Amino acid sequence: MDKRKELILKTIIKEHIKTALPVGSEGLVDKYNLDISSATVRNEMAELEQAGFIAQPHTSAGRIPTEKAYNFYLQNLSEKKLSEAEAKIFEKLLAKKDEISFKQTAKAMAKISDNAVFWAFHRHNLYYTGISNLLHQPQFSETALIYDISEVIDRVDDIIGQIFNDLKFGPQVLLGSENPFSQHCSAVVTKYRL
């Protein structure tokens, strides 16, 4: 993929993550000050659509990223580094190796990521926090997604039990059809040795 297509695709993904709305060429050019015309962006978007990176949910709508696009985005994402203060907080909490410290770590992770965190101490002992962070995201203005996520939360202990033994050390991204929690969201999972 050439640099211009990559820039357009990453911009579409970022905008869709922020708004949960289909993204149009004119909006991209205006909002992100792209140094190309909206006609050029439309042509590039047509090629990205042919390649399976974006889709048009209905006629005359903008485009939305596909699972293939999100995978590309994650593979090419530069890691966000924790600040020194954040890293020290995690080191201090994880050094204690007790359930209270792990819960505090999960809360800190939820705050920093502005997302939900699920922490399994073992197969049948689960803690979660940050659900309100998750539900404040723009895509949850759709009732169907709220229902989907509430079903996930209702059965999260069963899902954790199913994947617990298959988890590897180091982050794994579960996205779309590869995500046992829900195809409508992504999850980053890892195993941590006590």
What are the language-model segments listed below?
Residues 9-14, 188-190:
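Contiguous, well-ordered alpha-helical segments that form the cores/surfaces of helical PPI scaffolds
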